[in-house]
Every structure is written in C-alpha cells, then in structure tokens.
C-alpha cells in the first residue's frame, strides 16, 4: 500500500517521506504539511528502512516544535517508546549534547556554564566600559554575526572597516577570553564550538557521524553559516553517502538580522550535486483568495525556486483592506469587529490574531481590547526562565555545577543578602584578577585575609562552603550508595537560603506570593526531571545536567494550555502559527516595510525590502478563513501625530477594488453599532462553534 493511500499524503508529500537515494531538499510552502512529512519520514526510516531510532536526528528551531514533533512520531510507530531514542531537538540543544560529551577536547569542564542574555550584556558592558545600552547591543550583534559566520576575533580585527568595528573586535577578543576563564559559553558558542571541533578533530567527527546516520533539518531557510557548516560536517565524509533531508521555504526567510542566510538553500545544490528537489505547493490552511494575495505579494521578490501555493478550500471571503484615520481608530475598530464577529459566529477568542511589525504597535491595541473586555495574550512575552526569581535560583545551580562561573557567583552571593556588599566584591574581584582565578577560588586563596577583614570574609567563606556541600551532594544524586535525591538537595538549598522570606521582605505580599509560586513550580519541575525524568529512565537528566539545559528552555513542559484569548503577536513570533481570522495592522511605509537600520551589516536596500516582503507573506499566510489588513493615515510617534503612506505591499496584493475596501456597513461606528447588534440578534446563528460553516460577511 502506498503512502498516498495508507497515510493520506498527497503525491509530493509521499515522495518526500519515502525518498532514500541521497540528500533531499523539500521546498514546503506555508501550510503545506511539512511537519507531517518530517514525522512520516522518520517513521518510514524506522519501520521500513531498518534505521535504529538512536541514529536519527531531527533539528528544529524551537523547543516547542521539537516536543510536538517527538509526540507525533511516537503515535506513528508500532513501538512508541522508540521515539524516546530519537534526537529531536534544536540546533543549540544538539550543540550542548556534543559539547557535554566532548568538553575535554575543547578544554572545557564537563559542567561548563551557559551564559544567559543578561550575563552576556553585563559582560560586554564591563568590557566596553559604557552604560550606553544601544552601543552594547550593537557590539553584541556584531559579535553574534562574527560567531555565526565563523569569524574569530583576530580575523574580525583584520577586516575591521572603521574605528567602531576595531573597538567591537577588541571587545570581542576580550569577551572570548573572559568566557574561557569562566569555563562558560554563550548561545552562539553552542554551535560554533562543535563546528570548530569537527573541523579540527576527525576522530570526534567520525564518532558523531556514526551516532547520527540520518539527519533531518526543519526551517532550513533560517539557518546561518555556522548551522549549515554543522550540517555539512555531520553528513559528509570520505566514502560516506550524504543522507539527510532539509525542509524549508525561501519565501519565509525572515531572520537575516540574526545571521540567517537564504543563500543556504541555494548552496545545497552546489555542495550536493545529487540533491533531490521536491516541492510542496498544496496549502491545507487558507482559502484561495488569501493565497492569491500572498502569491501576488511574494512574486515581486526574485525567486530562488519557482513555487505557487494553491488550495482546495474554495475562494473564501474577500481580503479586506481598511484605511483608518489614526492608530486609535484602527485599534478600536479591530476590537469592535472581533467582538461582533465572535458573537455572530459563537467563535472562540482564540480564533483571532492581531499581527504587527513591532511590539510598540501593540500598546494602543491592548487598550482597545481591554475597553471591549476582550481577553488577549501576547506572543514573544517574557519567558518563564527569564523571570528574576527563576534566574536567582538558577544562579545557585550554575555555581554548584561550575565554580568558575563568576556571573552566577555574583548573583547568588548577593541574593538574598548575606552581608556581602559591592565594596567586598570589588576587593575580591581585584584579588581574583591579580591571580587569574575565579571569584569562588579567590575566597579560599592564601593572601585574601590581608585584603579583606574577617567580618567581610566570613560570609563569603560560609557561602562558598555551602556551595561546596551542595555540589558534593548533587554529584552523588542517583548513585545507589547515596541516600540523597534531587528533591532533598533542592529542598535543603531553598531552606538554607530562605528565599521565601527574602521575597516577602523585598516585595509586597501579592507580588511575593506570585514570585514564590513561580519558584515552587520551577523546583517541582527540577525535582521531577533531576532524578532522570518521570520514570527515571533518562540518565542524562541529572540535576546538574539540567542546569546546562535550562538556559535553552523557553517554557515549562506541561504548563497550562493556551487560554481562550485573542493572540497579539509580532509577525516574527507568529511564524508557524495559524488562526481562522487574522488582522494584519499597521501596513504602512516605514513600518511594513520597516525603515530598517542603516548600520545593520547585512542590509542593502533591496535585501531589506525583500525580507520585509517575506514578512508580509508570512503574515498573510497565517490566516485560514478571513484576513483584514489595515493602515493608518496618521500614527502617533514620540507623542506626535505623523502622516503615513499606505504600504507598497498592499498595492502588491492586487486585490479587486470592490472587495478590498469594506462597505460603510462593515466599518462599525458609534452610530451604526447598535443597529448592527440588533441585526445580529435577529439573525439565525450557526449551531456549532467550530467555524466550519460557509463563511458569511463580517458585520
């Protein structure tokens, strides 16, 4: 039985899922079922091609996508437990796995630290001796692009085009040296260091090629130079037939600003002449009218590959364009339309999304939604692991795992307060710098007594001894001879530092209660995972191993499902999502397309507009049933009302003029709102709330 009939795949999907004669590139248009193809292919490799699950790796760009993919694969396998043997992870999680296994080859401790964004910002701030946040971020951006482009500090210095570049390259050199002293890596190092290791050590590279015999890469258009090089190093070798499948869409490449290069798709055909190209063009998400608008916009970009999305969902509702007097009116109109449309259809709030180019556009929309009492969530908000109270606890775990981690030492020793002030840390830091040792080691180094009086040294040594005791216990967790477990170690740590008391002392009761509940949720998760997972079967998930992984996580597993609320999101954060009804707002020149940063290294005017056009395409293709695109004739900027021009992208949608502009009845004003409500009450409504009935006009 073919995959077409057995699993309901269309012909190109089936071909992609079963192709096994070498490297394969699947060009998967928006909504074309790419995740289904990847999961079916992995099942095919295991069930029909004799691959052991432990020799297959699938790489994604988010932890959520990786978890969902693994769950779907388990449902396809005759033995679902085999899914646990797969490597389904982000690029960065795979990098951690490689570095943890090969740390000694790179001069790293097994328990190296992973610096979070705040740590990296503070380090650059210290090295640059500036408090200019914009300058610090520019330097960070330059260093990230250098690392992702596999450019070392000396090469960056040699190619510096101006004095600003020279300054950034010098800071880059000091930054790399400081991380090495901390026995720490940053986010970009998690891929850069494995690439450098595989290039320089053939034996290690061969070992990992034997471990990972088939590689699948999702969202290939979002890979940077470093990630592409890692893929090549894993799949190529003397006498080795490259076995991998890359899945991507050149029309959805929207991350050039963080080093991704769309050229990686093209480069595949050069580096792998036998590459099989398969196109997925049938869209299972959107109506024909929505796809026509998307195809019309993206046709203005030069094409790496010809591709035309189509759908069997029928024409659907016309795409509407709304020209609003200002952003207040835009926000109010959208809120009222959502309220009316939801009432008419008995729809859920979660069926609606409001998408915009930048976070700043969301503020006025939030006010309008609150006025209409419409619940909403904001994508791309603060990660659970970015909360201050969680970072406080993580700093202890990082220090237990790696006593050379100076940023973790500084945060932990000062939170909660234990009599260690800034002056004490300055003296300790100077002493540690003199001897080229960590702050932790300096606490016990001979000669420190001459620098710090006993009253200042005593709390430091008490703290350091406490960390040493916890480290010894955490190392023993899981051993048969040890009575300790992760829960006991964590409970004793929390009791000793008295963090709950600190919260209620430092914050008002309601805020302290919320923060403490977050800490309890986090420690509960650690207790479960730190003993080898729910069933204790994962030896890699010891308490100290988890300390390394926490830096990569964006959410707790098993937290509450998405609430019934309107989704507000930037266009970048909306990628991969879909909604029955979408409002795409602020489609004006200077916003979408964005005016851009003239100092951004990757930007030329043409490249920037092309990427912005792809962003518009991503926004359009999030919509399943209805799409409203709005722009304002005036918009508030820095408390001033400025004139705005309609975006070129609206013109490029090539909408029929009669369809594109809402009728007077469709624009809800205070005068006609009551009449509209009466009409809705008199109108027969659908008998169910699943929005599967024939679309009606939005009133």
Locations of regions flagged by a protein language model:
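Conserved helicase C-terminal RecA-like lobe
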Residues: 161, 362-374, 387, 394-656
């Amino acid at each position: 039985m073919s995959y077409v009939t057995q699993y309901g795949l269309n012909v190109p999907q089936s071909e992609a899922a079963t192709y096994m004669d070498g490297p394969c590139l699947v060009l998967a248009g928006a909504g074309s079922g790419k995740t289904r193809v990847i999961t079916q292919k992995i099942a095919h490799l295991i069930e029909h091609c004799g691959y052991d699950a432990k020799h297959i790796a699938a790489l994604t760009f988010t932890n959520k996508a990786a978890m969902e993919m693994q769950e779907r694969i388990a449902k396809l396998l005759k033995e679902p437990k085999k899914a646990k043997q797969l490597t389904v992870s982000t690029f960065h999680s795979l990098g951690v796995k490689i570095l943890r296994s090969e740390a000694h080859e790179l001069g790293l401790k097994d328990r190296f630290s992973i610096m979070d964004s705040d740590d990296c910002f503070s380090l650059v701030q210290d090295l640059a001796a500036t408090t200019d946040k914009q300058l610090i971020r520019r330097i960070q951006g330059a260093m990230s692009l250098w690392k992702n482009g596999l450019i070392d500090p000396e090469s960056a210095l040699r190619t510096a085009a101006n004095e600003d570049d020279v300054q950034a390259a010098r800071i880059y050199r000091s930054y790399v040296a400081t991380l090495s002293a901390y026995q720490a890596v940053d986010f970009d190092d998690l891929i850069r260091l494995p690439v450098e290791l595989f290039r320089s050590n053939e034996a290690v590279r061969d070992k990992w090629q034997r471990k990972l015999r088939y590689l699948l890469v999702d969202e290939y258009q979002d890979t940077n130079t470093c990630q592409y090089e890692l893929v090549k190093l894993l799949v190529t070798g003397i006498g080795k037939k490259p076995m991998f499948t890359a899945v991507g869409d050149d029309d959805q490449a929207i991350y050039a600003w963080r080093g991704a290069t769309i050229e990686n798709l093209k480069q595949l055909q050069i580096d792998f002449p036998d590459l099989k190209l398969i196109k997925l063009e049938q869209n299972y998400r959107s109506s024909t009218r929505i796809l026509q608008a998307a195809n019309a916009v993206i046709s203005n970009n030069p094409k790496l590959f010809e591709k035309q999305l189509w759908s069997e969902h029928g024409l659907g509702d016309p795409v509407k364009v709304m020209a609003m007097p200002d952003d207040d009116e835009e926000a109010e109109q959208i809120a009222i339309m959502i309220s009316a449309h939801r009432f008419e259809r008995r729809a859920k709030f979660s069926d609606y999304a409001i998408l915009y180019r930048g976070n700043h556009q969301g503020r006025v929309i939030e006010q309008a939604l609150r006025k209409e009492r419409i619940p909403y969530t904001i994508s791309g908000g603060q990660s659970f692991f970015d909360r201050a109270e969680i970072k406080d606890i993580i700093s202890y775990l990082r220090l237990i795992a790696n006593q050379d981690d100076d940023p973790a030492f500084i945060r932990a020793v000062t939170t909660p307060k234990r009599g260690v002030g800034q002056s004490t840390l300055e003296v300790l830091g100077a002493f540690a710098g003199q001897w080229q040792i960590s702050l932790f080691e300096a606490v016990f180094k001979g000669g420190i007594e001459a620098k710090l009086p006993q009253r200042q040294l005593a709390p430091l040594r008490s703290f350091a001894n406490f960390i040493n005791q916890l480290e010894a216990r955490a190392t023993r967790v899981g051993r048969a001879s040890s009575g300790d477990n992760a829960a006991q170690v964590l409970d004793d740590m929390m009791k000793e530092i008295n963090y709950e008391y600190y919260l209620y002392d430092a914050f008002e009761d309601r805020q302290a209660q919320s923060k403490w509940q977050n800490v309890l949720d986090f420690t509960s998760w650690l207790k479960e995972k730190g003993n080898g997972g729910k069933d204790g079967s994962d030896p890699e998930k010891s308490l100290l191993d988890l300390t390394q992984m926490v830096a990569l996580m964006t959410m707790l597993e098993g937290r509450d499902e998405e609430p019934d609320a309107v989704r507000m999101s930037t266009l970048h954060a909306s990628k991969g999502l879909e909604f029955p009804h979408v409002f795409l707002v602020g489609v004006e020149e200077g916003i979408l397309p964005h005016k851009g940063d003239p100092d951004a290294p990757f930007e030329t005017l043409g490249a920037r507009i092309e990427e912005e056009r792809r962003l518009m395409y991503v926004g359009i293709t999030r919509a399943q049933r209805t799409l409203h695109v709005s722009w304002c004739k005036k918009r508030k900027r820095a408390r001033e009302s400025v004139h705005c021009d309609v975006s070129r992208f609206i013109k490029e949608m090539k909408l029929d003029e009669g369809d594109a502009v809402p009728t007077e009845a469709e624009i809800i004003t205070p005068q006609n709102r009551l009449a509209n409500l009466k009409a809705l009450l008199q109108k027969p409504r659908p008998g169910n709330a699943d929005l599967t009935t024939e679309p009606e006009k939005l009133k």
